[in-house]
Amino acid sequence: VTLIRHEEEAAAGLDFGSIATTVMLRLGEKTQPAALPEGLYGRLLGHSEEAWLTDEFLSEQLDASTCYSVMEMFGDEPEKWRGVLQDGHIYAPRSLTALLNKPSRSLYYDLKWSDENYALRCLRLFLKQVMLQTSLAALLSGAPALSWRVSMPGALPPYRQEAYLEMVRGLAREVAKETGMPLSARFPAVLYALENQADGWYFLSRSEVDARGGDLNLDIGGSTADLSLWLGGKNHAAAESSLLL
């Protein structure tokens, strides 16, 4: 029997990166990883503790809120890639050695920047699996509803930013319908910001910078470096840049 306490609505912050993706949950003033409890990393086959469903499907770290932005697909026909965990899954290797020994033909990455049809199909399944797992984590944390926060680097072409936002909005509705975890009625289902804005607002809200003076934020990712200057406690950057690496 699992007792679920009633908490405030959850906001999920989804940081989708070129190499790895991290998701955190905020419930009121509490922030925590969007991780699943140990019992849900159980056994698929057999009844012994040796038959864990961790190999490549789920991270061995029970509190992990970060995964590689890599999909393993079970077939080579992209038009048939429709179902999460049925046609492909987020690849979670046990070790770097396991990753190096994995046949590369079944692994798909560069999901953030590629315009290819197969990559966009992979991206949709990747984001849906992340959002399904996050919704379950929010439910088990006692949240009655959920909203999403996402960001993208300014260096990403505007049409790609818009396409990404529309994909997340559609998936938010789809995941809410499939899981029964409702979207928030108090906040927009999906809020979007450029990564420079998201970084600056985060540090201002945490009171980790000198609001009377200024601070310089540098966010180095797998494909971009986002730089912004914040002065006088204002809620917008005085200057900013997003550079491709």
Model-derived segments and spans:
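Phosphate/ATP-binding catalytic cores across multiple sugar-kinase/actin-like superfamilies
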Residues: T2-L3, C122-S141, N196-A211
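Gly/Thr-rich phosphate-binding beta-strand-loop-beta motif of the actin/hexokinase/Hsp70
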Residues: L3-T31, L204-A238
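Short helix-terminating capping/connector loops at secondary-structure junctions
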Residues: H6-E7, A138-A145, G180-F187, V209-R212
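Generic recognition of stable, solvent-exposed alpha-helical segments in well-folded globular domains
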Residues: F16, Y118, C122-L125, Y159-A163, ...
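Short glycine-rich, Thr/Ser-proximal phosphate-binding strand/loop in the N-terminal lobe
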Residues: G28-F57, E77, G233-L245
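Eukaryote-specific, cytoplasm-facing alpha-helical/coiled-coil scaffolding segments in long proteins
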Residues: H47-S48, P158, D226
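Conserved phosphate-binding loops in N-terminal lobes of ATP-dependent enzymes
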Residues: E49-M152
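Glycine-rich phosphate-binding loop and adjoining helix at the ATP-binding site
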Residues: V150-A198
